[in-house]
Amino acid sequence: MNTPVVDFVRRYAQQRTTRMHMPGHKGRGPLGCEELDITEIAGADELYEAEGIIAQSEANATQLFGTARTYYSTEGSSQCIRAMLHLALQMRPAKAGRPVLLAARNAHKALLYAAALLDFDIQWLWPAPDAAGALCTCPVEPEALSSALDELSAEGRTPFGVYLTSPDYLGFVQDVAGLSAVCHAHGLPLLVDNAHGAYLHFLKEGSRHPIQLGADLCCDSAHKTLPVLTGGAYLHLGPSVQADEAAVRNALALFGSTSPSYLILQSLDAANAVLADSFREKLDICRWRLGMLCRELDALRPGLALPLTGAHREPLKLTLDAAALGLSGQQLAQALRERGVECEYADPLYIVLMPSAESSAAEFACLQTALHAICDEAPAADVSVTAGDPAAFAALAGALEAQPRRFTIREAVLAPQEMIPAAEAVGRICAAPAVSCPPAIPIMVSGETVPPEALPLFARYGIEKAAVVKE
């Protein structure tokens, strides 16, 4: 597959043209990549008005992912999330009342800032009480979604879309096919934050990408699981989305810099050639190595590794339940760090390890050696550790559902605010989302009144300060 952006920039660098244009480094500098860092010079195209090499590269990505249309972002899935919500708002019927989105509660804070910028409300889908033991996960069954939509309809409210995160930070995958069928039966678009799942289209057994499963709008963080520089992402449109080219590019431009990174654009462009060539085989090898390691861990400490297989699990994320080692997630992460392995995420319960198709045999061997050593040295699984308490999330959900909303998300985010100790926040209006990052998933959402039920979760996830609206 051709790489028009990469080819153009390399030719330009080789020509040794005198650069009387931005950037100021003029192709020289300490990093070594400066000669490939350009701006929108003649022939380089423009990301938000693409007609040349960028449009050609995006057409290649569209073909690879099998979408109706795929667009590039150099500012991560956060930009794509805001853009696809803007598009969904534009598609809603005129004079439909104040806009409301139905969304699973484990959403990234980018959704909340989109709600503040675009001024819509969010009706939350909470996990069932027996499935609510972790901040990152919010399983939604089709029946529960259908019931929630019926309840909103009975109140005279029709959401402009349904929003899900799949896969989530712990590797849980929603039933996108079943949930999209419910959405479409109600005449609603399904929007999916697939930031962690760009690779799902390239599985040997067939695509598990949300667009192929019925999602209408979807974002992928290419940089999370593909060989792409940080910030590279995709906005995908499904076949049912009736939005013209200009509307989509305008939506992205609304939330993006007018100076998109050409290093990231080249990275996205180069990835197309990799995805079209050897990526599936390399991905399969990575999955095989990860499966072998998972089976070894099951033999050493049953219950340590969450399954890699099954309809609701993604196959490229190793999530470890640290309680099987008598440790907290943070303790297990530190033990790995001391042995030369850095994990993606750790909380009181779990750690998340994210290999990719680019992970080498030597890197897997290093991880294997480290985990074997920790398993040999760790205490028994019955040592007291901070465990997940589904009741804590259920209690928070009940408290928040029962309270009246005094501020919209937009009003709370833009209001004068102050930082106070989290333990003193009860009864105050949350201004900025109360999150730890990663995973950037809020315990409290802007505009909500902090109930006592939030305090145990603040403590569990290390949130010591809360931004509240000034009184």
Model-predicted regions and their roles:
Residues M1-G52:
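N-terminal "arm"/small-domain region of PLP-dependent enzymes with the aminotransferase-like
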Residues D298-P452, L457-I463:
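Conserved C-terminal alpha-helix-loop-beta "cap" of PLP-dependent enzymes
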Residues N2-R10, G76-L306, A322:
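Conserved PLP-enzyme active-site core in the AAT-like
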Residues R428, A467-K470:
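Flexible, glycine-rich loop/tail regions that form catalytic "lids" or insertion modules at the edges
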Residues Y72, W124-W126, D220, Y345, ...:
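Structural signal for conserved beta-strand scaffold positions within catalytic alpha/beta enzyme cores
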Residues A68-T70, G97-L101, P442-I443:
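Short active-site oxyanion
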Residues E34-Q79:
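Conserved N-terminal alpha-helix of the aminotransferase class I/II PLP-enzyme fold
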